[in-house]
Amino acid sequence: MNSPATLAAKLPWSEWLPQQRWYAGRNRELAAAEPGAVVALRDDLDLVLVDVSYTDGSAERYQVLVRWDAGPVSEFSTLATIGSADDHTGFDALYDPVAPQVLLSLIDSSAVRSSSDGQVSFAREPDVELPLDAYPRVSDAEQSNTSVIFDRGQAAILKVFRRVSSGINPDIELNRVLGRAHNPHVARLLGTYEIGIPGEPPEAACPLGMATAYAANAAEGWAMATASVRDLFAEGDLYAHEVGGDFAGESRRLGEAVASVHATLAEQLGTAQATFPVDHVLARLSSTAAAVPELQQYAGTIEERFVKLVDETISVQRVHGDLHLGQVLRTPESWVLIDFEGESGQPLRERRAPDSPLRDVAGVLRSFEYAAYGPLVDHADDKQLAARAREWITRNRTAFCEGYAAASGNDPRDSELLLAAYELDKAVYEAGYESRHRPGWLPIPLRSIARLTAT
């Protein structure tokens, strides 16, 4: 068998990568894709970092674990089959139960694997147990990474980063900080792995993945909220507080959990004073309005709102950065926040930058609107349903803010203009996203923008 690097270089990366749901280059023209680093984890399993370049001059690096076999394997789908190299076939190994178990075992033993391209270091956190005998299954959630669940005993979830970059990964960093501070609203970090490149300083290592505790009986916040909305819509003669699936109590508890996480991050990593990021939000507004004609009628008013805050001093700290109902889980004990990566499309430096806690609050409030208005996408003219949706939103916004205030002593509603600005910035981002990916959902952020600019 040829060397891992030789075989990996012969795979048809340019054809295979764009088919993967975690591939982020669909709006650009791919120029080239080739392995930049290859490290053998065992004889038939290689860790490959694929360097991708685009015709606009941008570049990215993706992690793929490649399992080799003598020929096609029936258990692998066409999507998981990368292609052939000499007399071997390469597969995305995360769809092979053996490969995730190998990764978890390497983390458990804090192993090291090296090649001329780099050194992969695995590390287990102190005083933790990993479910080495559990059978893995790949999560079917739509996301920018690939998560593998080990559901037995002390269950774990292994998140393998797909688009990778050098530097401190905020998801690992903040989970470690919160876990070591014993905050009850995060999943405990169990271990990590990263690659160091020859000639580069240790701080330039590239994080590749992390394992955290997994709550098998947890419910996703988004699923709970949308179920509550469906219950309300089905009970036409009842108010939101009268419906059996009322979500307000959970919204209040979620507010308390978010405030707790913010408090721990402030205690452990500090706070600072800064001015409202007017340049950043104006730049997003300008680029989005140019791409979304439906947004242009509101752009002038939104700009005025942002400019009014140019001299506003705000307290900033490390925050979640991309908080919404899909990033929270309800366990039997409490709410748990997950995925502390920040906005995945932003550079690492920006994702680690301190921001106002109102950024996270606004994210949850925007998510309430999505949960309630989502069912109206196909019923745009139903005024009764729209009124019911607004009732649900108002009730849950109030409950969340009350919970946050009770836990922190700071009511987000007291910073009305700032909170509205963060909501507007988030809605502008959503308008750009929906215009590109789900045009039918564009009315949701536009409805919110119309409301926020009218008050």
From Swiss-Prot:
GO terms for biological process: carbohydrate phosphorylation; glycogen biosynthetic process; trehalose biosynthetic process. Keywords: ATP-binding, Carbohydrate metabolism, Glycogen biosynthesis, Glycogen metabolism, Kinase, Nucleotide-binding, Transferase. Pathway: Glycan biosynthesis; glycogen biosynthesis. It is an enzyme of class 2 (transferase). It comes from the Bacteria. One of its GO terms (molecular function) is ATP binding. Its EC number is 2.7.1.175. It catalyses: D-maltose + ATP = alpha-maltose 1-phosphate + ADP + H(+). The keyword Transit peptide does not apply. InterPro entries: Kinase-like_dom_sf (IPR011009), Mak_N_cap (IPR040999). Catalyzes the ATP-dependent phosphorylation of maltose to maltose 1-phosphate. Is involved in a branched alpha-glucan biosynthetic pathway from trehalose, together with TreS, GlgE and GlgB. Monomer. Belongs to the aminoglycoside phosphotransferase family. This is Maltokinase. It comes from Mycobacterium ulcerans (strain Agy99). The gene is mak.
